[in-house]
Amino acid sequence: MASGKAAGKSDAPTPIIKLGGPKPPKIGSSGNASWFQAIKAKKLNVPQPKFEGSGVPDNNNIKPSQQHGYWRRQARYKPGKSGRKPVPDAWYFYYTGTGPAADLNWGENQDGIVWVAAKGADTKSRSNQGTRDPDKFDQYPLRFSDGGPDGNFRWDFIPLNRGRSGRSTAASSAASSRAPSREGSRGRRSGAEDDLIARAAKIIQDQQKRGSRITKAKADEMAHRRYCKRTIPPGYRVDQVFGPRTKGKEGNFGDDKMNEEGIKDGRVTATLNLIPSSHACLFGSRVTPKLQPDGLHLKFEFTTVVPRDDPQFDNYVKICDQCVDGVGTRPKDDEPRPKSRSSSRPATRGNSPAPRQQRPKKEKKPKKQDDEVDKALTSDEERNNAQLEFDDEPKVINWGDSALGENEL
């Protein structure tokens, strides 16, 4: 119905989505929630969305005659120190006759409403699908078989087989990702190390310039894939993804610092240069299959050789000494330094051990709490924002003080 170039997000296969039984689901306490995840504007004040195809999300459980509805704009605000701050709008899909604009007939003009319909839909009919209770049902992933919204909009990747646990995992990921992403350099580095770290920083900057960004849902999917295909997302600990670190058996790489920082530890990036590719692991390893009660176990034995004349040989040896069977230990330069002792000069008025008279401390004004800011929201905005997840601003990843090899990762 609407025109415009899609943003390249029409992935297949189309999921079969079941939206309730003969009666529409009851509406939850947080308001009229959409069955589907939102599309989000990439910046403020963009025009209303246009779609390459019909604009109706894929849903094989709905009759073709009822494949019509509307996208509704929902303003979003993020609490801040100086008051609430607007963030790009979100648009939610509702079937005709449901949701906040349930009293409108298809095609009636109203600000913030975009009507869409699939080919062959009876726009005079009204849907009996109701709306979603967020306390009982997760949002369904968006899929568009005939083309999605234009390039001013995006939506987060949600796996089709996501369970109810995805919400709490995403929340814990968001909390851990708020940790400071930069640390001061410790100690002095050699010229070669400085050059390597500069190259590592350039790699990350180039990736960030290209717009590489991992959403909360994508990070959760990365951490909960099949074990052999998992990768550690930003903000995750090693043991959150691959289990506790051990000694003398599988899972024995990583000291306590690496376990806590995950990929933020620069030694991870350096060591990945020594890890075989999938093809190298398959065709260059000694493969040993073994049938076990729980299934087929495949063991891959691969040897990576770092020549002694390699410029980073000493750095790789140091990383292995620290991280192989490193559970319970930390790098020496990461341990807290003892406070320097005062010089043993005779006491004078200037350095007398007698305590100085302290000035009274000024009382700090209490910061404005988020709940006070939330009081400035209208009831309609509170209802709208109840089903929204604010996007975290991309963090600059610190790759640490260790070596990086010649190959870009």
UniProtKB/Swiss-Prot annotation:
SUPFAM superfamilies the record matches: Coronavirus RNA-binding domain, Nucleocapsid protein dimerization domain
Compositional bias per record (Polar residues), positions renumbered to this chain: 57-68
Annotated region (Dimerization), positions in chain: 226-333
Record carries keyword Lyase: no
Basic and acidic residues biased stretches: 180-192, 368-384
Compositionally biased spans, kind Basic residues: 70-84, 358-367
Domain CoV N CTD, first and last residues per copy: 215-331
Keyword Transmembrane helix: no
Secretion signal, residue range per the UniProt entry: none
Quaternary organization: Homooligomer. Both monomeric and oligomeric forms interact with RNA. Interacts with protein M. Interacts with NSP3; this interaction serves to tether the genome to the newly translated replicase-transcriptase complex at a very early stage of infection.
Known function: Packages the positive strand viral genome RNA into a helical ribonucleocapsid (RNP) and plays a fundamental role during virion assembly through its interactions with the viral genome and membrane protein M. Plays an important role in enhancing the efficiency of subgenomic viral RNA transcription as well as viral replication.
Protein name (Swiss-Prot/TrEMBL): Nucleoprotein
Lineage: Viruses, Riboviria, Orthornavirae, Pisuviricota, Pisoniviricetes
Underlying gene: N
